């Protein structure tokens, strides 16, 4: 197999080749590095590429395999991470000039766990500034969608999705506060998973709102995400939010099919006036495929979900404004105008609003829990629309554009599950007439990521979307 072909393989395929010693980790890493060198100037997916460190780590991985020591299925597999996650000795910018010289002295827990599993870090990925975009002039280049270089990637884990879609790297980590893993996954045509709150450590994540933040994997398939989640999930003494709930056998859930699975279609999200008709049609087709595949499908109602964005804004945005207040006071012009305005606006939200928003969030959580008592998973569109042209991103000229182009509108269907803390995943479910990807969102019960991954993998197996790649 040629080096160019190696870069196109997913985690599972690479695992088999590496453990059979048919290829070396160094060969795989060199193939990915060559593809990054060729395509990153077009995509701006990577901020930092750690070439020499990656090659050294690959050689160590090869040496261990040669001695009969395997650290698991990720041993020797390349990965990259959103630049909001600490990486020891590698600068971590959080997508901002504010942190362009910050070099952490330790890894984020999720990064450390992937390294401990034998995975090889290639570098750091581009993102919306501070995770709080959109940004008119991103300091490290405009991330571009591999399916159409004039379209947005979504965010804020922009490079995490585009790098997987373009096959620069088979596995990435992102972070999700209101949809920042699932949104770019949907718009770039890959799989992205936000785990249950407390399933994965926050330690070393430069987040926005700790109650809503979560790190998680992005990859070309649900099975690849399952392998990554197994490595990063679990209790962490450095993060009191993490729980002692046992980590499931995620890989074991893959391949179980849809027989006996009960799926609830969220009525309010499917009937949303903000949902573009072509995306609604693709999601409806996905639901039909799930039913034909053996699932039992019914409609469920979550009345308060229509107000989730207001709840989200009232809680998350003041939290972000407080977090970045010192920089707003001392270095405001080192923050792009759009996130700066958004942070300043958020600082004006009265403190009295926040307790009420939290109470409404608890009611929303109860309604989602109630819906999940009757079914195993919920499904909905991931985004209301496909990727928008970069030229119009951030310009708001109508009420519809305010919801479907601005950050709040993009997260209209994803932020409810940051508020409630349920696990949620986006899996590709087809393409629009303009050949732009759309995503199906799958939501599960607390700590039941295995159910979400099972349904996503089963859907992939009965549809052709998993094997589609953009021509970059």
Question: Where in the sequence are the language-model features?
Answer:
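An N-terminal boundary/leader segment
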Residues: 1-55, 292-294, 468-472
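Short helix-loop capping/hinge segments that flank enzyme active sites or metal/cofactor-binding pockets
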Residues: 2, 74-94, 252-267, 315-369, ...
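Acyltransferase
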Residues: 25-29, 59-62, 252, 275-301, ...
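Conserved hydrophobic/aromatic pocket- or pore-lining residues that grip, position, or stack substrates
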Residues: 32, 54, 76, 82, ...
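Structural helix-boundary/capping segments
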Residues: 38, 116, 165-273, 284-293, ...
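Long amphipathic alpha-helix in the N-terminal Rossmann-like dinucleotide-binding domain
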Residues: 52-62, 118-119
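Short glycine/serine-rich loop/turn segments
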Residues: 74-215, 266-269, 382-402
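Conserved short alpha-helical elements in the N-terminal third of ANL/AMP-binding
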Residues: 91, 416-419
């Amino acid at each position: 197999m040629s080096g160019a072909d190696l870069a196109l393989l997913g985690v599972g395929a690479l695992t088999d080749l590496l453990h059979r010693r048919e290829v070396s980790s160094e060969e795989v890493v060199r193939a990915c590095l060559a593809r990054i060198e060729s395509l990153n100037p077009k995509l701006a997916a990577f901020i930092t590429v750690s070439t020499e460190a990656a090659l050294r780590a690959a050689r160590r991985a090869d040496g261990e395999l040669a001695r009969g020591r395997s650290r698991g299925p990720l041993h020797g597999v390349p990965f990259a991470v959103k630049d909001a996650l600490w990486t020891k000795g590698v600068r971590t910018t959080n997508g901002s000039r504010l942190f362009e010289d910050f070099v952490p002295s330790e890894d984020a827990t999720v990064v450390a766990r992937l390294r401990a599993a034998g995975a090889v870090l290639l570098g750091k990925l581009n993102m919306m500034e501070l995770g709080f975009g959109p940004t008119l002039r991103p300091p490290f280049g405009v991330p571009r969608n591999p399916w159409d270089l004039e379209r947005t990637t979504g965010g804020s884990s922009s490079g995490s999705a585009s790098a997987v879609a373009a096959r620069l790297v088979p596995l990435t980590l992102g972070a999700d506060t209101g949809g920042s893993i699932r949104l770019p996954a949907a718009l770039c045509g890959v799989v992205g998973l936000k785990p249950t709150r407390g399933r994965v450590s926050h330690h070393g994540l430069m987040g926005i709102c700790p109650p809503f933040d979560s790190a998680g994997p992005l990859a070309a398939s649900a099975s690849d995400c399952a392998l990554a989640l197994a490595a990063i999930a679990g209790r962490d003494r450095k993060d009191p939010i993490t729980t002692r709930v046992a980590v499931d056998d995620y890989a074991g859930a893959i391949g179980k099919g849809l027989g006996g699975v009960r799926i609830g279609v969220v009525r309010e999200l499917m009937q949303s006036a903000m949902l573009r008709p072509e995306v609604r049609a693709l999601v409806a087709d996905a639901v039909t495929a799930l039913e034909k595949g053996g699932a039992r499908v019914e409609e469920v109602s979550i009345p308060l979900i229509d107000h989730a964005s207001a709840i989200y804004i009232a809680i998350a945005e003041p939290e972000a404004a407080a977090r970045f207040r010192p920089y707003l006071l001392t270095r405001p012009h080192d923050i792009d105008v759009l996130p700066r305005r958004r942070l300043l606006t958020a600082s004006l939200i009265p403190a009295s609003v926040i307790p009420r928003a939290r109470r409404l969030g608890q009611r929303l959580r109860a309604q989602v829990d109630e819906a999940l008592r009757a079914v195993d998973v919920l499904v909905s569109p991931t985004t209301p629309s496909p990727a928008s042209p970069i030229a119009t991103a951030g310009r708001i000229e109508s009420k519809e554009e305010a919801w479907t182009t601005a950050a709040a509108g993009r997260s209209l269907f994803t932020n409810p599950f940051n508020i409630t803390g349920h696990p949620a995943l986006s899996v590709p479910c087809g393409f629009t007439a303009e050949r732009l990807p759309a995503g199906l969102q799958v939501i599960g019960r607390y700590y039941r990521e295995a159910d979400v991954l099972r349904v996503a993998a089963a859907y992939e197996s009965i549809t052709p979307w998993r094997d589609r790649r953009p021509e970059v």
